[in-house]
């Protein structure tokens, strides 16, 4: 289980507070202006026609607000929401049980929708297109099919891996929206909003310091704020200034560009052991004692996005920007 402070994945201990931090309406939702603006138009149009909203696919890196947007869609449409995840729907009966509880207009949110089996996908197709469910019971010559009518509903699917969705499933979504990494000023606004909910006083500069180290991800920004709050509480203050915030983050080994100890170890190994690369993924994994899949799925995306690392046909290479950040250029000179 990935328990990195800078992990974009949801961590179990965050459940109790996370829901209370989530915005409930578009006007409270910071960032993702393009996706938010388009969704708002589609929702208003559906309401004007007294129709259900088309099925929506949200994709992008973890921690950017896909689950929150699904809840906001339901709130803005004035309907209920049922929430599940791809791995939880193992058998046709699991899907039938969920679909049979939907009220007219409800939102069904399926997180990690790319992890649905092909069998479940095929049952989902008529449910999405014709609002009906075909259930087969019995085997061989005794097999019988029963069609169950469903109320109109909106399926909101969320995935971090849109490419893993089958084309037939992907094509049945009328609305497809990509969520992008957040800008620093957007994350600073999120940190300030969360601090207010925590009844903390935080300066704009301190919010900015936390935002810069949050890897473009609200989930990480809120997690870092929780840890900075711990340092503030032990120091006997409810006021977070830039000095306190920066000191706390330094002690947590999160540098000014949002890199932690694992990132440092990976990038330094590439320079000090392999001259900056190219180096193969398996070789790099063995060198730093990490799983190759974990490096590829968890560590690399941010390093690639920020220009610290590049992939080539011959392997991974560190960039000049990364060398400058770690001071290797000066040493070479």
UniProtKB/Swiss-Prot annotation:
Binding site for Mg(2+): 67
Location, primary (coarse class): cytoplasm
Sorted UniProt keywords: ATP-binding, Cytoplasm, DNA damage, DNA recombination, DNA repair, DNA-binding, Hydrolase, Nucleotide-binding
Region described as Small ATPAse domain (RuvB-S): spans on this chain: 183-253
Enzyme category, top tier: hydrolase
Record's GO cellular component terms: cytoplasm; Holliday junction resolvase complex
Keyword DNA repair (UniProt): yes
Binding site for ATP: 21-22, 63, 66-68, 129-131, 172, 182, 219
GO biological process, one term: DNA repair
Region (Head domain (RuvB-H)): 256-333
Sequence intervals crossing the membrane: none
Free-text comment on this protein's domains from its UniProt entry: Has 3 domains, the large (RuvB-L) and small ATPase (RuvB-S) domains and the C-terminal head (RuvB-H) domain. The head domain binds DNA, while the ATPase domains jointly bind ATP, ADP or are empty depending on the state of the subunit in the translocation cycle. During a single DNA translocation step the structure of each domain remains the same, but their relative positions change.
Name of the protein: Holliday junction branch migration complex subunit RuvB
Provenance organism: Exiguobacterium sp. (strain ATCC BAA-1283 / AT1b)
């Amino acid at each position: 289980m990935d328990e990195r402070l800078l992990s974009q994945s949801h961590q179990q201990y965050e459940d109790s507070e996370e829901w209370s931090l989530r915005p409930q309406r578009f006007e409270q939702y910071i960032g993702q202006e393009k996706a938010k603006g388009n969704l708002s138009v589609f929702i208003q149009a559906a309401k004007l026609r007294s129709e259900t909203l088309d099925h929506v696919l949200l994709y992008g890196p973890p921690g950017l607000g896909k689950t929150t947007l699904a809840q906001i869609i339901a709130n803005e449409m004035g309907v209920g929401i049922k929430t599940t995840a791809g791995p939880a729907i193992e058998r046709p009966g699991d899907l039938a049980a969920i679909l049979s509880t939907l009220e007219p207009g409800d939102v069904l949110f399926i997180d990690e929708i790319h992890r649905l089996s092909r069998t479940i996908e095929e049952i989902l197709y008529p449910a999405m297109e014709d609002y009906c469910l075909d259930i087969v019971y019995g085997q061989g010559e005794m097999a019988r099919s029963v069609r169950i009518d469903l109320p109109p509903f909106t399926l909101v699917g969320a995935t971090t891996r849109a490419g893993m969705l089958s084309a037939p499933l992907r094509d049945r979504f009328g609305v497809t929206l990509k969520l992008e990494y957040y800008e620093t000023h957007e994350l600073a606004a999120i940190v300030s909003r969360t601090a207010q909910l925590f009844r903390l006083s935080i300066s704009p500069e301190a919010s900015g310091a936390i935002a810069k180290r949050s890897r473009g991800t609200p989930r990480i920004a809120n997690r870092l704020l929780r840890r900075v709050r711990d340092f503030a509480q032990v120091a006997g203050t409810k006021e977070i200034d830039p000095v306190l915030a920066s000191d706390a983050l330094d002690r947590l080994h999160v540098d000014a560009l949002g890199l932690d100890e694992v990132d440092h170890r990976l990038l330094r190994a590439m320079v000090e052991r392999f001259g900056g690369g190219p180096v193969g993924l398996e070789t790099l994994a063995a060198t730093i004692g990490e799983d190759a899949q974990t490096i590829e799925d968890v560590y690399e995306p941010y390093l690639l996005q920020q220009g610290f690392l590049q992939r080539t046909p011959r392997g991974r290479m560190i960039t000049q920007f990364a060398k400058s950040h770690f001071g290797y250029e000066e040493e070479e000179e």
